[in-house]
């Protein structure tokens, strides 16, 4: 049962499909996802990865890894001394990502898990960095704080998180209104919806290191690098 979040901004649309529906949808499109949406999203994911500045030997988690393009880049960045962990709700996406990593000879550096990011199967303070690209906005509004808390739990003190998301901040463009109309009409197909990314991270107790505002086909996008405060 969904709970009401009294502090949630009223202009954030709800997610009107279940997680099981999301899983089935992404399983179905996993082999063609790169053709359908991957090329549009990849540019912004790569910018966020550059800002996150993953270093050799680090332990990093990606939530919502999709077809594995970013996992591959991160595995190359951490080298043999590091380790990448990936979580995705779709077993179909996991198989596509696994195939990509195997083909690149990087599978030994990556551990993949099919499950819900709201409950991560990892120890406290395990990761140097975390990454999400067009994933946080797939969670319903009351669940976003819980996901960010769970990410914070598994980050080391001073660890960083890089997130790319569709943005509702200062957003009232015609393209945004059309997209939100499509989200209401086809909630499974158009399941991303704009959120307040920086505000959500601040509310969850993160420190903001960097924020950029960009456009994706006229739709506002935020890239934020945030830090888990020491002593938390």
Predicted regions and their residues:
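Core SAM-dependent methyltransferase catalytic element
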Residues: 205-206, 210-232
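A short acidic, Gly/Pro-enriched loop at the edge of an enzyme's catalytic core
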Residues: 118-130
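Class I SAM-dependent methyltransferase SAM/SAH-binding core
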Residues: 61-119
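Short alpha-helix
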Residues: 189-205
């Amino acid at each position: 049962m969904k709970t009401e979040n009294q502090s949630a901004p009223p202009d954030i649309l709800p997610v009107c499909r279940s997680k099981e529906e999301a899983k089935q949808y992404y399983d179905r499109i996993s082999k063609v996802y790169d053709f359908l949406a991957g090329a549009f999203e990849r540019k912004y994911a790569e910018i966020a990865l550059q800002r996150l500045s993953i270093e050799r030997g680090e332990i990093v988690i990606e939530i919502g890894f999709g077809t594995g393009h970013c996992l591959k880049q991160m595995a190359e960045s951490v080298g043999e001394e590091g380790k990448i962990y990936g979580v995705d709700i779709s077993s179909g996406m996991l198989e596509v990502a696994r195939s990509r990593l195997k083909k690149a000879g990087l599978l030994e550096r990556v551990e993949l898990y099919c499950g819900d990011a709201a409950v991560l199967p990892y120890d406290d303070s395990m990761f140097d960095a975390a990454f999400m690209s067009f994933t946080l906005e797939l969670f319903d509004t009351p669940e976003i704080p819980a996901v960010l808390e769970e990410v914070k739990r598994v980050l080391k003190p001073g660890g960083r998180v890089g997130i790319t998301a569709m943005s509702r901040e200062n957003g009232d463009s015609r393209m945004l209104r059309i997209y939100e109309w499509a989200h209401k009409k086809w909630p499974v197909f158009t399941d991303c919806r704009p959120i307040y990314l920086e505000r959500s991270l601040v509310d969850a107790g993160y420190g903001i290191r960097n924020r950029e505002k960009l456009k994706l086909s006229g739709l506002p996008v935020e890239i934020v690098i945030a830090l888990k405060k020491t002593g938390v």
